[in-house]
């Protein structure tokens, strides 16, 4: 039987996941993180993107995170997300439209374009589309 630890993924709105997992993958402030049983204690910011949860027995779940905090303690990992949305709850058409609009803003020749905000919106839309894609593959 594979080693596991307890994971809680919560947002301001609701608890998204609580249970035993074999590992998770998430994007921290310094890059990609893989958290396995026995990981050293850690507290880090999470960048907007996804969390890949490998549950007990290898089943996978993907959740979009708009950012937040990851805390790793012995046998327990907590993700406090600003916003968390399950892959199956994301709207693909809305994410595609947001991506298109962000790309238009970036390529716009107007001087009043906020590139940082447009880039953040583009990254958010791309991350949501990736979560949708991976969720479909896992089903």
Swiss-Prot record:
SUPFAM superfamilies: Epsilon subunit of F1F0-ATP synthase C-terminal domain, Epsilon subunit of F1F0-ATP synthase N-terminal domain
Molecular function via GO: ATP binding; proton-transporting ATP synthase activity, rotational mechanism
Bilayer topology annotation: Peripheral membrane protein
One GO CC annotation: plasma membrane
InterPro entries registered for this protein in UniProt: ATP_F1_dsu/esu_C_sf (IPR036794), ATP_synth_F1_dsu/esu (IPR001469), ATP_synth_F1_dsu/esu_N (IPR020546), ATP_synth_F1_esu_C (IPR020547), ATPsynth_dsu/esu_N (IPR036771)
Coiled-coil region list: none
Classification via Gene3D superfamilies: ATP synthase delta/epsilon subunit, C-terminal domain, F0F1 ATP synthase delta/epsilon subunit, N-terminal
Keywords for the protein's UniProt record, in alphabetical order: ATP synthesis, Cell inner membrane, Cell membrane, CF(1), Hydrogen ion transport, Ion transport, Membrane, Transport
Compartments in which it is found: Cell inner membrane
Assigned protein family: Belongs to the ATPase epsilon chain family.
Function field: Produces ATP from ADP in the presence of a proton gradient across the membrane.
Subunit structure, as described in the record: F-type ATPases have 2 components, CF(1) - the catalytic core - and CF(0) - the membrane proton channel. CF(1) has five subunits: alpha(3), beta(3), gamma(1), delta(1), epsilon(1). CF(0) has three main subunits: a, b and c.
Record-given protein name: ATP synthase epsilon chain
Organism of provenance: Escherichia coli O157:H7
């Amino acid at each position: 039987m594979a080693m596991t630890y307890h994971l809680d993924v919560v947002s301001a709105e609701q608890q998204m996941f609580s249970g035993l997992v074999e590992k998770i993958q998430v994007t921290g402030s310094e890059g990609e993180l893989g958290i396995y049983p026995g990981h050293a204690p850690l507290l880090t910011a999470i960048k907007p993107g996804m969390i890949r949860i490998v549950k007990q027995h290898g089943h996978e779940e993907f959740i979009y995170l708009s950012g937040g905090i990851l805390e790793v303690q012995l046998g327990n990992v907590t993700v406090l997300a600003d916003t968390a949305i399950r892959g199956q709850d994301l709207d693909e058409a809305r994410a595609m439209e947001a991506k298109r609009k962000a790309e238009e803003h970036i390529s716009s020749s107007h001087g009043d374009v906020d590139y940082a905000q447009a880039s953040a919106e583009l990254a958010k839309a791309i991350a949501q589309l990736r979560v949708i894609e991976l969720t479909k593959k896992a089903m």
